[in-house]
Swiss-Prot record:
Name of the molecule in the record: Interferon-induced GTP-binding protein Mx2
Ranges annotated as biased composition (Polar residues): 39-50, 58-79
All residue ranges annotated as the GED domain in the record: 619-710
Region (G2 motif): 147-149
Keyword GTP-binding: yes
Localization per record: Cytoplasm; Nucleus
Keywords: Antiviral defense, Cytoplasm, GTP-binding, Immunity, Innate immunity, Nucleotide-binding, Nucleus
Lineage: superkingdom: Eukaryota
G3 motif: region residues: 221-224
Organism the protein comes from: Bubalus bubalis
Gene transcribed to yield this protein: MX2
Length: 710
C-alpha cells in the first residue's frame, strides 16, 4: 500500500489537547535512523465532527525537506501556527513530492522502473484491511482468505462535488456513480485479471475516487499472505507476493501483525518473515501491531517489549493501532467514532498509554508517520531514479533503432524507404569485404576469422612435408624396386620421384576443400547475420535476401571448389623454374650434408648437379629432391588456395550479393510485399515509442521538480 497525502480540509476532533499529542518536526536526512524511541506525529483528523479548514498537523509549520531520515519514533511536542501557514508549508514542502511520484505513476513509468512507495503486507486476519480502511476512509472488499488478489492503486481526491469514481485495468475503464459499486467492481476486475480462483497477479488495478468525504492520498494495497495454498491457489503464492513490490529497494514495507501472536518466534508471522527476507537489516520495514484489545491479561509486557524494539528489531521501529472490529462494523460504527474510541483506549490503558505518550499509538499518528517516511524516501530515491530513467531511456532508444522507422503508406515513399534499407545493408557488406566493420571488444572481424583458417592450412602443408620425410626410406625403397630400370646405383629414377610427389600432393586436396567449406560457413553466417540485423522485421524481404545469399553461396562454393581441384591437377605436372629449383635444391642438400657432418668446403660443392654423388645412395638423393620440391610447392599452395577462397567466397560473393540486392528495386510491384512487417514489429515499435515518451516526460518532471533542482 503506497501512501501519499495532499492538502485537504477535514473536520477536526473536538477533544481538547492532551499531553499524549506531543510536538514533532518532520526531517528528511540520509543518516541512520535514531533509536526506536517514540516519534510523535500529528494525526490527519479526517474522521471527526466539527468543521475545520484543514486536517494538516500543526507540526507541518516546521517542515524541512533536507534528505535526512526521520527518527524512528522520537517523542516531540506539537507546535501551533496559523492554518494558512500550515497549508502553505504543506503546499511548498510535502505536496510537490507526492505529486511528483503520482505524476510519474500516471505516466505509466512504473511499468519501466520501481517508484518510491509504502507497501502494506499482512497475514490473513492480521487486521490489514482495517488499517487500510482507517487510513483511506474507503471500504475495500472484505471476507475470508485472500481477498485482495491484485495490487490496487487507490487514488483519492477531495473535491466539493458529487461522489465519482473510475476503475481502470488492462484496456478497460469503468465509470462509477456510487460508492456501493466499488467493492463489486474491484472483485470483477480481479476475476478478469487473476481468474475466478484464489491466484494472485502482479497487474495493477487503478481506482480513482473523487468526493468531499475522502482524504487526498494515494494507496497501493497488496494481496494478503496465506500460510497454506488453498483450492487451486498456486503453491508458491508467498513467493509471488514477495516478487510483486516488497522486494524492491524503493519500497518501504509496512508489516501488519496482530498483538496476540508470537512475534519472537515468528511462527505465526509470515509477513514479518517475508519482510526480513527482502530487507534483512530492517532498513525499510515498519511494524504495525493491531488488535491490542485482544491481548490476554498478563501478556501486555510482551507487547511493550515488541514496541520497544527488544523482541524483533526493526530500525524504523513499531507503531500500534486499534481499528474497528467486526462487531463495530456490524453496528455501523463510524470511522470518526472509531478514532475517538481508539484514542480513549490508549489513554486509559494501564500498560499501553505510555505508547501514546511516546507517539507510537493511534491511527492518526500512524498516518503522519507514513507521510514523513514516504516524503523522506522520495527525496532519497530521486538521484537513483534519475539515473535509472536515463539508462532505460538510452536502452529503449537503441532498441527502437533496430526496428527502424514506420513504413510509409505511399508507394513512391516505399521505394525510397527500400532503397535506404538496401543501401545501408550493402554498405555493411562492403565493410565486411574490406575488413572495416565495427565489432565488439570480444569479437573478430570477418577477414581475421578467415585468416585464422588459412593459418591452419600452413600447418597442414608442414605436416605433409614431415610425413614425407618420416617414411622416405620405406616409400623410396618400394618405388625403387617397382620403377628402377637400368640406372646404376646413385642415379635418381625420375619416375620414382614423380610418383611420390603426386601421391602426397593428392593428399592435400581434401584438407583444402575442408578449409574452403569452413571459410564459406564463416562468410555465409556473417552475411546471414547482417541480413537479419537489417531485415529481420520484414518477413518477406528477409527471406528473399536469405535465399539470395544461399543461392550465391552455393554457386561461389562450386566455382571455388572446381578451381582448387584444377590447381591440384596442375600440380601433378611437377614443375618449377630451374633458377628457383636450383637454389632450393642446393639449400636442402647443404642442410642435409651439414646434418651428416659431410658438408664440402670446395667451391664446386655449391654448384648444382656437379658434385660427386658416388657415395650417396639413390634414397638420399631422392630425399633431397623431394624436400626441395615440396618446400617450393608448399610456398605456392600456401598462398594460392587462400587466394582462391578469398576471391570467390569473400570478394566476389559479397559483390554478387550487393548486385542482387539492387536488382530487388527493379520489381516495383512487390515493394509492399517485401516491406510487410512481422506481426509484432509494429506493436514493438509502438511500445518502445510510448516507453521513450514516458521516460522523456519523467525526465522533464524530475527536471522541473524544485527540490530536486535545488
Amino acid at each position: 500500500m503506497s501512501l501519499s497525502f495532499r492538502p485537504l480540509k477535514y473536520k477536526r476532533h473536538t477533544q481538547t489537547s492532551t499531553p499524549h499529542h506531543p510536538k514533532q518536526d518532520i526531517y528528511f536526512h540520509e543518516q541512520p535512523p535514531g533509536p526506536p524511541l517514540g516519534q510523535t506525529m500529528s494525526p490527519p483528523q479526517w474522521q471527526v465532527e466539527e468543521s475545520n479548514p484543514g486536517f494538516l498537523p500543526n507540526n507541518f509549520s516546521q517542515l524541512n525537506l533536507d534528505p535526512q531520515q526521520p527518527e524512528a519514533n522520537g517523542g516531540q511536542q506539537r507546535s501551533k501556527g496559523p492554518e494558512n501557514n500550515l497549508y502553505r508549508k504543506y503546499e511548498e514542502k510535502v505536496r510537490p513530492c507526492i505529486d511528483l511520484i503520482d505524476s510519474l505513476r500516471a505516466l505509466g513509468v512504473e511499468q519501466d522502473l520501481a517508484l518510491p512507495a509504502i507497501a502494506v503486507i499482512g497475514d490473513q486476519s492480521s487486521g490489514k484491511s482495517s488499517v487500510l480502511e482507517a487510513l483511506s476512509g474507503v471500504a475495500l472488499p472484505r471476507g475470508s482468505g485472500i481477498i485482495t488478489r491484485c495490487p490496487l492503486v487507490l487514488k483519492l481526491t477531495k473535491r466539493e462535488c458529487e461522489w465519482t469514481g473510475k476503475i481502470t485495468y488492462r484496456n478497460i475503464t469503468q465509470q462509477l456513480q456510487n460508492p456501493s459499486e466499488v467493492e463489486w467492481e474491484i472483485r470483477r476486475a480481479q476475476n478478469i485479471i487473476a481468474g475466478n480462483g484464489r491466484g494472485i497477479s502482479h497487474e495493477l488495478i487503478n481506482l480513482e475516487v473523487t468526493s468531499p468525504d475522502v482524504p487526498d492520498l494515494t494507496l497501493i494495497d497488496l494481496p494478503g499472505i496465506t500460510r497454506v495454498a488453498v483450492e487451486n491457489q498456486p503453491q508458491d503464492i508467498g513467493l509471488q507476493i514477495k516478487a510483486l513490490i516488497i522486494q524492491r529497494q524503493e519500497t518501504i514495507n509496512l508489516v501488519v501483525v496482530p498483538c496476540n501472536v508470537d512475534i519472537a518466534t515468528k511462527k505465526y508471522t509470515e509477513a514479518l518473515s517475508m519482510a526480513q527476507e527482502v530487507d534483512p537489516d530492517g532498513d525499510r520495514t515498519i511494524g504495525i501491531l493491531t488488535k491490542p484489545d485482544l491481548v490476554d491479561k498478563g501478556t501486555e509486557k510482551g507487547v511493550l517489549k515488541v514496541m520497544q524494539n527488544l523482541t524483533y528489531h526493526l530500525k524504523k521501529g513499531y507503531m500500534i493501532v486499534k481499528c474497528r472490529g467486526q462487531q463495530d462494523i456490524t453496528n455501523k460504527l463510524s470511522l470518526a467514532e472509531a478514532t475517538r474510541k481508539e484514542t480513549m483506549f490508549f489513554e486509559t490503558h494501564p500498560y499501553f498509554r505510555v505508547l501514546l505518550d511516546e507517539g507510537k499509538a493511534t491511527m492518526p499518528l500512524l498516518a503522519e508517520r507514513l507521510t514523513t517516511e514516504l516524503i523522506w524516501h522520495i527525496n532519497k530515491s530521486l538521484p537513483l531514479l534519475e539515473n535509472q530513467i536515463k539508462e532505460k531511456h538510452q536502452r529503449a532508444t537503441e532498441e527502437l533503432q533496430q526496428y527502424g522507422d514506420d513504413i510509409p503508406s505511399d508507394e513512391g515513399d516505399k521505394m525510397f524507404f527500400l532503397i535506404e534499407k538496401i543501401k545501408v545493408f550493402n554498405e555493411d557488406i562492403g565493410k565486411l569485404i574490406e575488413g572495416e566493420e565495427i565489432v565488439m571488444e570480444t569479437e573478430s572481424r570477418l577477414c581475421n576469422k578467415i585468416r585464422e583458417e588459412f593459418t591452419s592450412w600452413i600447418l597442414i602443408l608442414t605436416t605433409n612435408i614431415e610425413k614425407v620425410k618420416s617414411i622416405l626410406n620405406e616409400e623410396v625403397s618400394k618405388y625403387e624396386k617397382k620403377y628402377r630400370g637400368k640406372e646404376l646405383l646413385g642415379f635418381v629414377n625420375y619416375k620414382t620421384f614423380e610418383t611420390v610427389v603426386k601421391h602426397y600432393l593428392g593428399q592435400l586436396i581434401d584438407p583444402a576443400l575442408k578449409m574452403l567449406q569452413k571459410a564459406m560457413e564463416i562468410v555465409w553466417q556473417t552475411f546471414k547475420d547482417t541480413a537479419k540485423k537489417h531485415f529481420a522485421e520484414f518477413c518477406n524481404l528477409h527471406q528473399t535476401v536469405q535465399n539470395k545469399i544461399e543461392d550465391i553461396k552455393t554457386k561461389q562454393m562450386a566455382e571455388a571448389a572446381n578451381l582448387i581441384q584444377l590447381q591440384f591437377k596442375m600440380e601433378k605436372l611437377v614443375f618449377c623454374q630451374d633458377q628457383i629449383y636450383g637454389v632450393v635444391l642446393n639449400k636442402v642438400r647443404e642442410d642435409i650434408f651439414n646434418s651428416m657432418g659431410k658438408a664440402s668446403e670446395t667451391p664446386q660443392s655449391k654448384q648444382p648437379f656437379l658434385n660427386d654423388q658416388s657415395s650417396i645412395s639413390s634414397i638420399v638423393e631422392i630425399g633431397v629432391h623431394l624436400n626441395a620440391y615440396f618446400m617450393e610447392t608448399s610456398k605456392r599452395l600456401a598462398n594460392q588456395i587462400p587466394f582462391i577462397i578469398q576471391y570467390f567466397m569473400l570478394q566476389e560473393n559479397g559483390d554478387k550479393v550487393q548486385k542482387a540486392m539492387m536488382q530487388l528495386l527493379q520489381d516495383t510491384q512487390h515493394y509492399s510485399w517485401l516491406l510487410q512487417e512481422q506481426s509484432d514489429t509494429a506493436t514493438k515499435r509502438k511500445f518502445l515509442k510510448e516507453k521513450i515518451f514516458r521516460l522523456t516526460q519523467a525526465q522533464q518532471a524530475l527536471y522541473e521538480f524544485p527540490h530536486f533542482k535545488g
